[in-house]
């Protein structure tokens, strides 16, 4: 052993660092005994806390870490990731460093799922490790990631066949995956691999391409064609009282339609309004916007008009329907609304009659009423400016009572009525428009009309009167004289005044230009629509005529059919037989029958005092007192009700008779005021 004393400078100790440097500067010879296995001497860490870089031995290999991702994974995606020369998702590995060595091995892989789905989505992505590259598709769904939250899985060398060296020409392992969600984007994979490379080799530079002909011009990128679908069930609010009354219509609201483009779905609102309206019917229209370009349009329409309640507890439950007429000149069709041209229009319409023996809410389908009116339409649309749109018109909503099959209530009640199901497909790829082929009708439907003309918008008014008719059921005998039993009301539910003279119809018939002649088919298929963009749909609706109730004389037979309880206990036939047996004269028999009829008519006085008192199967009628009360002013009616509460019904009736007779009320009726 050699002992080295500590040196001092001017009596002070030399700094340790200088001492150590002095010690290292002295040469020392160390003799070691021979050993079978020599270990590399442990290098002492330098005191200056500096790190020394490790210089790899030439030809020993290297270790690298690669990070890459697999993006745009849908919830229903499936596939496999092969690790080795086939790893195309990481070119730096497969086409880069891997070509500079003879062997490699991947010692670890980390598979992370990065979620990009919303919290409302559902589903998962299962994954499976194949260490020998023998599987082509997922065979086990034990391991999986939920698409709404991130996940992570790590595999070491023993799991991924990473303990042995592999030739750079063969793959090491695979990861297979498959999702069970929707087609929307769910997220991406972030993959980290740690690789070791062994036995480097020299890679010659690839020879450059031989000179060739000048490159041809780059082709124009292929246009991405759009495909758009609108589908929905338009609705509107109506007002109805009984099946013997006409219905009233509100303004049409915006319609909520499902909008589908390139398999992506959301909701949109389409504008709707009444195309034309009069006292008998109203034709609705749905306005459809069209993006710039040329489109082949196909529309499927199923017309069915169920009505439903708007209040609890039966809200949205069907309580009847509004039937169609069988006018062959009406049907589903399209028209120009703004900045479009419509050509090659072809519309086929069908209808389905109701069976005469079928009864709904006490009414039959014995006057040509139709339950459904369907249509199929194809056309070619070209936009000519901004904000382009066309409209879909449909069979008219009939207001007359013969088409009203909604359940009867004692007062005017709001109902929701469906217009029908409409599906509109716009295909930008098609360029030839519709083919001139006749579509087969639905089973059980009658072919109504086929047309090649679009709908014209009204330009002038027409005051031609239209004769109307009311429902005649099996138990209701037809009345003589035409319109004595026609009950019509305006929108607010009140009868029109008798003095007001209003024509029955204002405006053109929008279906007047539609023809069913086959001779015009060739010309219509090859010509453009004659409509011009200057034609605009009507703005605010014009005042329309409404029919009015002039008088009502019910026959005894009609009253007895409505209310069997007014029967006096014997029929006309019973009295005729009794007269013959007693040997009476025909004059006496007729006199007694007249008395019986008077008793039946007088029975109406006990029917009640309110129009909205009860349900009577669709045949509720007002009593005589109700007709008198309707003539009172607001203040007189309030006084009548006060007298009825304080002094009784008899005094109230006396007050009513004095007011109707034009007399001043008795002072006894004013004492409590």
UniProtKB/Swiss-Prot annotation:
Keyword Aminoacyl-tRNA synthetase included in the entry's annotation: no
Site keyed Cleavage: positions: 436-437
Region entry Readthrough domain (RTD), spans: 203-669, 203-673
Alphabetical UniProt keywords: Capsid protein, Host cell junction, Host periplasm, Virion
An annotated GO cellular component: host cell periplasmic space
One Gene Ontology molecular-function label: structural molecule activity
Record's keyword annotation contains Membrane: no
Composition skew (Low complexity), residue ranges: 50-59
Pro residues bias: start-end ranges: 208-220, 535-544
Compositionally skewed regions (Basic residues) per UniProt: 9-23, 37-49
InterPro entries: Luteo_coat, PLrV_ORF5
Region annotation Disordered: where it falls in the sequence: 1-63, 202-222, 456-490, 503-547
Entry's family note: Belongs to the luteoviruses readthrough protein family.
Protein name: Readthrough protein P3-RTD
Organism: Beet western yellows virus (isolate GB1)
